[in-house]
């Protein structure tokens, strides 16, 4: 979802019932009107689909998350990217594809269509659904996705600015589902399952750590049986012995946690 995260939008409007999934959402120009009429709101159509780009030179094909944007929209922040998308049709690809050997001028046929496009350049675009992102002009995306019968269709309305209450009213009037950017992450293929898996892993790690700490505390207490007996013989109260044991364990846990966090930070760095 890094590609969606880096786009300078705040909300997305989808077709009702699409569950934030671009491939299940189809909107038309009339969905833009209620948002465009709100002061301080920038609204622009966004097309998104997954395509296979076949190399015209017989090289390796590319699996892309293809985003169609209007060249003069707020989604395109770089002047050179605006100029590229406003010119003859072409692809602006994620920079990691350049590291894999893709070069400016390479030509690809997209999505089983007859649309062949040259690579115009590269930008940091990230990924969506584990596929590197490629940008094309919106009308080019519509031609790839729908052929000659695009009829102004796109996937979602990208929004920036405005008051939440006013946007909710506009969304109800337009008959669309309005989501924040973070809510839209759930529509990325595999995102919910992967998030759930990571949550389960974290839960298991916490449970295992609690069991390990408990086992260590038990072993430490057993090893101190004679010492505890001596303290009792010397008149130590049960409260003192409990505080002493728990204090030692807390100190050990704190030191071990600090070492673990420091080690993890070094690995991440």
PLM region descriptions:
Residues 172-213, 218-226, 230-231, 242, ...:
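Peri-transmembrane interface segments
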Residues 230-269:
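Transmembrane alpha-helical interface segments in multi-pass membrane proteins
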Residues 38-45, 179, 257, 261-268:
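Alpha-helical membrane-embedding segments
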Residues 50-55, 62-189:
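Basic-flanked hydrophobic alpha-helices used for secretion and membrane insertion
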């Amino acid at each position: 979802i890094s590609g969606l995260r880096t786009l300078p939008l705040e909300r997305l409007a989808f077709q009702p019932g699409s569950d934030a999934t671009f491939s299940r959402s189809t909107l038309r120009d009339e969905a833009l009107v209620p948002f465009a009429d709100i002061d301080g709101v920038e609204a622009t159509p966004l097309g998104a689909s997954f395509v296979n780009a076949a190399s015209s030179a017989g090289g390796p094909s590319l699996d892309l998350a293809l985003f169609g944007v209007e060249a003069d929209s707020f989604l395109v922040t770089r002047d050179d990217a605006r100029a590229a998308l406003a010119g003859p049709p072409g692809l602006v690809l994620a920079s990691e594809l350049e590291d894999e050997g893709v070069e400016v001028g390479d030509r690809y046929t997209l999505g089983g269509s007859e649309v062949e496009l040259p690579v115009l350049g590269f930008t940091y675009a990230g990924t969506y659904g584990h596929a590197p992102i490629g940008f094309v002009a919106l009308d080019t995306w519509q031609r790839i996705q729908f052929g000659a019968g695009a009829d102004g269709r796109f996937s979602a309305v990208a929004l920036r600015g405005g008051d939440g209450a006013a946007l909710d009213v506009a969304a109800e009037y337009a008959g669309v589902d309005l989501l924040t950017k973070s809510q839209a992450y759930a529509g990325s293929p595999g995102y919910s399952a992967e998030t759930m898996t990571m949550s389960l892993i974290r839960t298991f790690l916490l449970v295992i750590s609690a069991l390990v700490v408990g086992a260590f505390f038990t072993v430490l207490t057993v090893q101190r049986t004679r010492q505890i007996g001596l303290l009792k013989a010397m008149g130590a109260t049960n409260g003192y012995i409990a505080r002493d044991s728990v204090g030692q364990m807390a100190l050990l846990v704190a030191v071990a946690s600090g070492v673990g966090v420091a080690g993890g930070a070094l690995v991440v760095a």
